A protein has these predicted regions:
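C-terminal domain-boundary segment and adjacent tail
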Residues: 58, 213-223, 241, 245-268, ...
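A glycine-rich, often tryptophan-bearing local segment used as a flexible ligand/cofactor-contacting loop or short
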Residues: 77, 81-148
């Protein structure tokens, strides 16, 4: 039987390793109306991020009880439903507390209406929704992006009444030079004029929200400058020469690194071999095995990147070949050239997933390697069942999360039925413990891609370094990217040197995993 923090009947969760044991955050979200399901999603996204700083409890705001805030060191409310009927006890307790409160999006007007004199207490007043084309949010002097698709939701504008009590800590700028307060802080209350969890990207205002969540979850958070690099999609089909060259370079720059290994390479239909099927066990290719051992000697840590990193003998969605396709999730490419996530694979079950994990671990053993302790799901996609298996089989994941609506009714994760027609991904800039109970090593900067694919633009070292610069707004952010070994090593050198010149020190993934 698998028993994890995600499957016990509670809405209270442990923080990530290194979180502040003296901190405990209450996270509340909206749950009524047509978009009530979205409230749960946003609450879970906030909760995942809060785990870096503290343990937490997450549940619907409607279930708040008087005095509940007294058991916590801070409160986060995510307002996604216009005029959600918030309990009077919640409004009164927020107005009475001196603990840090972060309020996002809707219903701040309920709080101001309940106050005796909101402007006197906090130094600002919530006003009206601004629907101008605000596409930039400046926070800590860094200009972050705001997707045009978010504009139609509006930004709740504030007015500063007393600059000795309140200030705009982030300002949005529209396309004609007008400005709107994006985040306002007065006394112990910080207010963000939207829920910045939709239409996010690597340079998005989401980064500012992450940092503001950290000020509530752990006001004494460390400000380390650490970096991670992962060498991606390494299998028996790779070039030992390229792998050794990468190891030599990284070692010369005092850069520990991770190698994401696919232990069993298959091309079931001979897609890259003139129609002749190929299957290569790691142990069968001594050149790659020796190169991996060489990489270990130069500071490399091997992790498991799926078993075959593909599914059956079908295009899922590309070729059916290892490293190309999804393994634990079905996907197709639509007529607009977007990858569409369909459902978990037909065989999806704990026993099926455990079987693949065990086969993968056996491949490592047969090739003379110790069992990896860290797992990376292929294409960062799996079912809730799979994530529970990964949690039981490894000490951490190294990825971005994929979550489904319905898994966490009232914050009690694992008691609901995941709705795979409503899935959402989330990237993290630092170590978290997500709602599956798993310690998640971050990867948020992406990778070098020389050409556009599936409507994703090319991504060069300069793009990755720009995202890293934007991530500096987040206290304790880990600059984490990955690199495919078939690319010219000059791209890797540019990123490593760029991050080091920014003052970041590369560390092993296992160091970040410890907190």
């Amino acid at each position: 039987m698998l028993l994890t923090a995600a499957t016990t009947a509670t809405n209270s969760f442990a923080g990530a390793p290194g979180s502040n044991a003296n901190q405990n955050t209450l996270i509340l979200y909206d749950s009524t109306g047509q978009w009530g399901w979205l409230g749960e999603d946003y609450g879970i996204m906030a909760a995942n991020l809060v785990s870096h700083g503290s343990k937490y409890t997450v549940h619907a705001a409607a279930n708040y009880v008087a005095g509940e805030i007294n058991g916590y060191t801070g409160l986060v409310y995510v307002g996604s439903t216009y005029d959600e009927p918030l309990p009077t006890a919640l409004l009164d307790d927020v107005l009475a507390t001196t603990k840090p409160v972060l309020w996002m999006g809707d219903n701040i007007w309920q709080l101001s209406a309940r106050a005796t004199n909101f402007a006197t207490q906090y130094g600002f007043t919530p006003m009206f929704f601004d629907f101008t084309n605000t596409l930039t949010v400046t926070y800590k002097g860094v200009a972050l992006q705001r997707n045009a698709l978010a504009v139609s939701s509006g930004l709740l504008q504030t007015v500063i009444n007393d600059s000795t009590k309140a200030q705009a800590i982030a300002v949005a700028t529209n396309d004609v030079g007008g400005t709107v307060n994006w985040a306002t802080k007065g006394a112990n209350l910080t207010y963000i004029g939207e829920v910045p969890f939709s239409y996010t990207g690597p340079n998005d205002r989401y980064l500012a929200a992450i940092d503001l969540l950290g000020t509530v979850s752990n006001p004494t958070m460390l400000a380390r400058k650490r970096a991670l690099v992962r060498i991606e999609d390494v299998s028996a089909d790779d070039s030992p020469t390229q792998l050794r060259a990468i190891a030599d370079y990284l070692y010369s720059k005092n850069v520990p690194f991770t190698v994401a290994v696919i232990p069993f390479y298959v091309d079931p239909n001979g897609y890259y071999n003139n129609g002749v099927p190929v299957s290569l066990h790691l142990r069968q290719v001594s050149g790659v095995v020796n190169a991996l051992k060489y990489m270990q000697s130069k500071g490399g840590t091997l992790i498991m990147h799926g078993y075959t990193h593909q599914y059956s003998n079908v295009a899922n969605p590309y070729s059916g070949v290892s490293a190309d396709d999804f393994e634990f999730y079905r996907a197709h490419i639509n007529s607009s050239n977007y990858v569409v996530y369909d459902t978990p694979v037909a065989e999806d079950s704990m026993s099926w997933t455990q079987g693949r994990i065990q086969k993968g671990l056996l491949e490592f053993s047969n090739a003379g390697f110790q069992a990896p302790t860290i797992f990376e799901p292929p294409h960062y996609a799996a079912s809730a069942i799979d994530y529970q298996v990964f949690n039981a089989s490894f000490t951490a994941r190294y990825d971005r999360g994929l979550y489904a609506t319905g898994w966490c009714p009232n914050g009690v994760c694992g008691t609901g039925t995941p709705n795979y027609t409503q899935i959402y991904g989330q990237f993290f800039p630092y170590l978290v413990r997500d709602i599956y109970g798993t310690v998640v090593i971050p990867e948020q900067l992406g990778n070098v891609e020389l050409v556009e694919f599936n409507n994703n633009p090319p991504r060069f070292p300069a793009d990755i370094l720009l995202s890293a610069q934007n991530n500096t707004v987040i206290k304790d952010s880990v600059m984490s990217f990955f690199f495919h070994p078939y690319l010219d090593i000059s791209y890797l050198k540019q990123i490593v040197q760029g991050l080091q010149s920014m003052g970041y020190t590369f560390v092993p993934a296992n160091t970040v995993k410890q907190g």
